[in-house]
Amino acid sequence: MVCKGCGTNCKCQDTKCGDNCACNQDCKCVCKNGPKDQCCKSK
């Protein structure tokens, strides 16, 4: 999914988070649940 969780001032066009990820304030994919090595993969 596209990184929608960032604020409007964040440029996240290139960031895609996996299904179990959310976007943090730095436009990085962060885990919502599950092991970190499985949930946060860029697509």
From Swiss-Prot:
What keyword terms does UniProt attach to this protein? Cadmium, Copper, Metal-binding, Zinc
Q: Which GO terms describe its molecular function?
A: metal ion binding
Highest rank taxon of the organism: Eukaryota
What InterPro entries would the database entry show?
Metalthion_5
User: Mind telling me which Pfam families this protein's record contains?
Assistant: Metallothio_5 (PF02067)
Q: Name one GO biological process term.
A: cellular detoxification of metal ion
Q: Does the keyword Zinc apply?
A: yes
Domain description from the entry?
All cysteine residues are arranged in C-X-C groups. These are thought to be the metal-binding sites in other metallothioneins.
According to its UniProt entry, the function of this protein is described as: This protein binds cations of several transition elements. Thought to be involved in metal ion homeostasis.
**Which family is this sequence assigned to?**
Belongs to the metallothionein superfamily. Type 5 family.
Q: What is this protein called?
A: Metallothionein-3
